[in-house]
Amino acid sequence: EEQVRVIPVIRELAKKGVAISVDTMRATTAKLAVEAGATIVNDVSGGAADPEMFSTVAKLGCKYTLMHWRGHSKDMNEKAIYGDVVSEVIEEISIQLDKALAAGVKRENIILDPGIGFAKNPEHNWEVLNRIDEFVALGYPVLIGHSRKRFLGGDHPDEREEATVAVTQSLVGKGIWAVRVHGVKANVEAIRS
């Protein structure tokens, strides 16, 4: 089902020269997506959901976003228990990072995502953002996906756009490779101001 939905769209976008990142935890989908024109595989499981993901990405030679993950969304809130969230997330993401490198994923193809909103309560998310320099210090590009997430407040995602822009603006100059947002124009304007 995932492949039926995304592969035809990727093919059409690639024909138009659009840069494409595919969001999947499945190695087979990642392979087909890259063959169809995607250039980045964004794996929210950080390689934990599919044992074939790292070897597949290594063979494909594409960019790979490795996100911190403690399990599927149905039970991730129960797993939001940390002593020191930043140290533990770095430790856990480093384990997956070592596995990716051992499987042959090239260092220059890896992008790290600390997993804002995944197995983290609001305080954890803010702590990660406040200490983002510790992730940047790992020496990999860092992607932050904070857009419209619950920890920003508001009952509806649209009510979180202003806070999304404020967080984006706060990340300027901190060595972040990219932010993943919904309201692109407002975030670009915030970065340029």
Residue ranges and their predicted role:
Residues 1-19, 25-28, 34-35, 39-99, ...:
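Active-site-adjacent loop and "lid" segments of alpha/beta metabolic enzymes
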Residues 96-109:
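Phosphate/pyrophosphate-binding loops at sites that engage ATP/ADP/AMP, CoA/4′-phosphopantetheine
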Residues 116:
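Active-site metal-binding loops of divalent metal-dependent hydrolases
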